[in-house]
Design a protein with these regions (language model features):
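A short secondary-structure junction signal
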Residues: 142, 189-191, 199-207, 231-232, ...
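Loop-centered beta-sheet repeat module
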Residues: 203-250
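Outer membrane beta-barrel
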Residues: 26-198, 213-227, 303, 308-332, ...
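Outer-membrane beta-barrel pore domains
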Residues: 26-31, 39, 59, 65-67, ...
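Bacterial N-terminal signal peptides that target proteins for export
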Residues: 1-9
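C-terminal ends of transmembrane alpha-helices
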Residues: 196-200, 253-254
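Sec/Tat signal peptide C-region and signal peptidase I cleavage site
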Residues: 17-24
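Cleavable N-terminal signal peptides
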Residues: 11-12, 22
Length: 391
């Protein structure tokens, strides 16, 4: 009964929101880009982003046996973004403060630093970055969460982001060199970062902690045909333009030595993706596989892998966008019965482009025996409604 009520509420909300004028443009005007303060060659742009969220469905567990339906209202993301140029237009900087899953059940509220970096834009083909920023792997993860097609990113890519560190592993201090050549037909980035560090708990088996490790090295390349170059990464283009990009990445950290026991492990990740859009239609495919190879017999080798395919179609005038995604995440391909399958369908409405929008998703998980979260249920359903205010 509660699920039917929730579905009816969601349909009603979207019916009201979509009831604006059926013509090109958004109900509340075009997107805003924050406030910019200029001082000669230096400038500062300030932006604020809020993502209120309501979840309902199989959110809590009755001990270890089954799920219980429950609702949860929280702020999925809070962002304060400060960015611009320093002294010259060839030196860019960014400082972004973040609060994730604020007041979500079971979450410890905390303010953190998502980005803190400086870039030297020596040339289109040569950009140097130093500071805290994303490591260059996973197409869907490199796209801003402000421009996601679907409310949450895929389960497998979220797991891959935790491969090279304990805390905020995907957003860690790095030094990188990247750029675009041949008018953007070829793009690249090569990065080095600390990865796993001394004292961090890396394996629950045997309570293994890190003694020392080599740096993590990451490289990504992208190719696009002439006339189909992507100007900036996004999942949702709101019916404008076209792009087609093939991407590949590899990341590796070796010689991660455990404390006291004398064993060590190596970690590698490889990935491949294809993304494209033409006017209102957008689609994306991504595959990632990673390996954790330990000399500790109690840990041995693990090989998770996952892929997803997602698509959406932006309907101009009413500014609605039906979306869907199918994902398979194998928690360890070295073992049997460890697959998780996730199906997502939803609808986005854009009132002011990405500056004000609302998305609603139904997410259905199916679990193999060895990755079930509870003993009595091998599936769960979650309903999500999320708004974004970005100014």
């Amino acid at each position: 009964m509660k699920r039917k009520l929730f579905a009816a509420m969601a349909v009603t909300v979207f019916g009201v929101l979509a009831g604006g004028p059926a013509h090109a443009g958004f109900l509340f005007g075009e997107e805003t880009k924050g406030v910019t303060i200029n001082n000669n060659e230096s400038d500062l742009n300030v932006r604020i982003r809020l993502q209120p969220r309501f979840d309902f469905g199989d959110l809590v567990k009755d001990g270890t046996s089954s799920y219980e339906s429950q609702g949860d209202i929280y702020l999925r993301r809070i962002r304060l973004e400060l960015g611009g140029h320093l002294l010259t237009k060839t030196i860019a900087y960014n400082l972004t403060l973040t609060g994730d899953k604020w007041d979500k059940a079971g979450n410890a509220n905390a303010i953190g630093i998502q980005y803190a970096y400086v870039k030297w834009l020596a040339d289109d083909a040569l950009v140097f970055t130093v500071g805290k920023e994303k490591l260059p792997f996973s197409r869907v993860s490199l796209s801003s969460s402000s421009k996601q097609l679907i409310v949450e990113r895929p389960v497998s890519t979220e797991a891959a982001k935790k491969l090279f560190g304990l805390t905020d592993a995907y957003y860690q201090p790095k030094f990188s060199v990247g750029g675009r050549l041949a008018e953007g037909l070829f793009a690249y980035e090569v990065a080095v970062a600390d990865g796993w560090q001394n004292g961090e708990a890396i394996q629950s088996t045997g309570a293994r902690k890190v003694l020392s490790a080599n740096p993590v090295y990451v490289a990504r390349v992208e190719l696009s045909p002439p006339g189909w170059v992507e100007k900036g990464k996004s999942d949702a283009y709101l019916g404008k333009g076209q792009h087609l990009t093939i991407g590949a990445n590899v990341a590796s950290q070796s010689g991660i030595e455990y404390q006291t026991v004398g064993f060590e492990e190596d970690r590698t990740l490889t990935g491949f993706d294809v993304s494209g859009h033409y006017n209102g239609f957008t689609a994306q495919f991504e595959y990632n596989a990673w390996e954790i190879e330990s000399t500790d017999p109690a840990i041995a080798t693990k090989k998770p892998k996952g892929w997803y395919a997602q698509a959406g179609y932006f309907i101009d005038g009413i500014n609605l966008e039906p979306v869907a995604r199918y994902e398979v995440y194998d928690h360890d391909s070295e073992a049997n019965d460890k697959e998780e399958k996730i199906r997502t369908v939803g609808l986005n409405w854009y009132g002011k482009g990405h500056s004000f929008k609302v998305g609603a998703n139904w997410v259905h998980h199916e679990f193999d025996t060895k990755v079930k979260e509870v003993t009595n249920d091998d599936s769960k359903d979650i309903y999500q409604v999320q708004a974004q205010v970005y100014f």
